[in-house]
Structures are given as C-alpha cells and as structure tokens.
Amino acid sequence: MSGKVAVLGAGSWATALSRLLSKKGCQVVMWSASSEQAREINETRENRHYLPGVMLPADIEVTLDLEKALYKAKAVVYGVPSHAFREVARRSLPYLPENAVLVNVAKGIEEESLYRMSQVFAEEAGLSMLDRYVVLSGPSHAEEVGRDIPTAVVVASPNMERAEQVQDLFMCESFRVYTNPDVVGVELGGALKNIIALGTGIADGLGFGDNTKAALMTRGLAEISRLGMVMGANPLTFAGLSGVGDLIVTCTSMHSRNRRAGMAIGQGKSLEEALSMVKMVVEGVRTTRAARRLSEKHAVQMPITEQIHRVLFEGLSPAVAVNKLMTRGKTHEMEEVALAAAMVGKIKL
C-alpha cells in the first residue's frame, strides 16, 4: 500500500511511525492538537519533547486541521493515548475517507466503560466499521523504532485482508509485522502488561533483583492470560509479540514510562511525584483501575494487579504489598490458568 497516510497524534509513537511510513514512500500528514508542537516539528523536523534526537523527513507535514489531515487518506493511524481515543475517533468520523484502513496503536482500556479500544471505536462508529479496524501492538519503543533498530510487531483484525494491508503498509527491513485474527487478545496484552511493568519498576525501586522481576513477569503473564481467556482471547496470543513480547520489553527497558514511574514509587515517591518525573502518559495507572474492576466483574483472581492498585490508590507501602504477595496461600502453578480455561470451555479439568 502506498499513497497518503494520516497519523492522528504527535506523541513519540505517532512520530516514530510517521517517520517509518515516510521513509517507505507514503505521503504522511500528522495531526496535532498543539499549534506550538506543529510549528516546532514543521520548522525543525524534530519532535523535541516526545522524540528528541530523531530527525523527520522533510516531506512530513504537521497540521492542526483534522479534515485536511484525513482528506483522501488511504490509511488512518490513531496515535493518541487511550484516554483520548474516543474523542479523536468521534471527531474523525465525518472526515474518514471511504474504504480507508483504520489502524489503532493505543494500548489501554477505557476506564469509565471498561472497553477495549476496538469496542470504543465500534460504539462511536458502528459495528460495521470494525471491518476496517486493525490494531497494531507488540514490543516497540518509539525511541528504537525511530532509529531503525530491528523491531517485530503484530497486527490484528477480524478482517485478515485488512490486517495484511497494514502488514504491507508498515513492513520493512527494520520493522517486521505479523498478523493475528485475535483482536481481543492483542488489545488486552498490550494494555495489561503496563500494570506488571509498574510492578517491576516498583521492585527495582525497592532494590530487589532479577529473581523478583522474573517472578512478577511470569505470574503477571498468568494474570493477563486468565482475564484474557475469560474475555474471549485466544490463550496462544499471550505467548506472542503482544503478550510476552511486549511484557518483557515494558518491564525491562530504560525507555518504559511505566517501569520508570514504578521505580520512583518504589523509591518512596508518591504517584503524583512519579508521574511528574516521567512527564509523559503512563498508561498503566488508568489501566490498573480498569483491570481491577474487570477482575471483579469476571471473578478472575489478579493478585499482582490488586496489590499494585493498593499501592497506587490506597496508600499501601510497596514493601508491604510484596510481603502480601509472597505470603499468599499456596497453589498449584497451573491451577488458576486451568480454572480460567475451564470457565470458557477451552479445556476440561
């Protein structure tokens, strides 16, 4: 696929993807809600606040005019944070070109409705529009994609023809793209791993070691899988790029906002202080609240998520939270996953 691509948003991820698409020969128009940001990028070819040091091709245009950005676009990339997705999706609807493929790259759960991003889009645009909807997710820090460091991601859609369109749109020698029909699993994996990354950051802040982080990541993946299966995901998806892949990179990377915020909390900072230090959106904070409610709604045990919620919002000491996790009642490693699978008829106990 070639032609015009509208990228809605001008954060780090939207900027990195705009650069990638431009280098592939697409006509890229970015939409920003900030006149100062649009002017800076157009004049300096750099997004100094969100992706410093990465120079953008001269033919990328940044506009404040949403209608202009979307005019005759063959593909539309929604590159805004999850809490802003509904509003931007709603505003874009009158200007969406007929038959344009729609790509969402936000990783989160809407806190008020508990909807995944595809559900938010369907509510705003109608179920029929999901035929054009594709989610892109996986272990992909903008700081590395913007420097052409080899990266692999996954795109998911109920319409595999659309998924393959997006695969062709983004795929290049430094950015490998796989397809997957499991929209539920890909969206949940990308959202829920941010909670566990907060936890591994807290462990780092407390001075714990690799054993602790490995335990959090492994048992965190079990929580993600349990909830995902009950919500209709294919459990195999969580063994892929949007599951364990994204979990690893977000829990271990110096680029991870969620890990950095967690580390500050582990070192004794308040949530507000930690968010101020990171200076960018930390998706895991909102997702923690949403995931806790989802676990209650679906009667799924998520002990790590529960303790992180208590640390973030109920004043529990991080050290006490670790103690509560370590002194839980004993259980079989596979028992909880098997119970979740049995609830959705995947396997028999």
Swiss-Prot record:
Cellular component annotations (GO), alphabetically ordered: cytosol
InterPro entries cross-referenced by the UniProt entry: 6-PGluconate_DH-like_C_sf (IPR008927), 6PGD_dom2 (IPR013328), G3P_DH_NAD-dep (IPR006168), G3P_DH_NAD-dep_C (IPR006109), G3P_DH_NAD-dep_N (IPR011128), NAD(P)-bd_dom_sf (IPR036291)
One MF term in the entry's GO annotations: NAD binding
GO biological process, one term: glycerophospholipid metabolic process
Annotated NADPH binding sites: S12, W13, K107, A142, R257, V281, E283
Residues that, per the record, bind sn-glycerol 3-phosphate: K107, G138, S140, K193, D246, S256, R257, N258
Catalyzed reactions: sn-glycerol 3-phosphate + NAD(+) = dihydroxyacetone phosphate + NADH + H(+); sn-glycerol 3-phosphate + NADP(+) = dihydroxyacetone phosphate + NADPH + H(+)
Catalytic machinery residues: K193
Documented EC number(s): 1.1.1.94
PROSITE patterns, alphabetized: NAD_G3PDH (PS00957)
Subcellular location: Cytoplasm
Pathway stated in the Swiss-Prot or TrEMBL entry: Membrane lipid metabolism; glycerophospholipid metabolism
Pfam (any one): NAD_Gly3P_dh_C
Enzyme class at the top of the EC tree: oxidoreductase
Main location: cytoplasm
Assigned protein family: Belongs to the NAD-dependent glycerol-3-phosphate dehydrogenase family.
Protein name: Glycerol-3-phosphate dehydrogenase [NAD(P)+]
Gene: gpsA
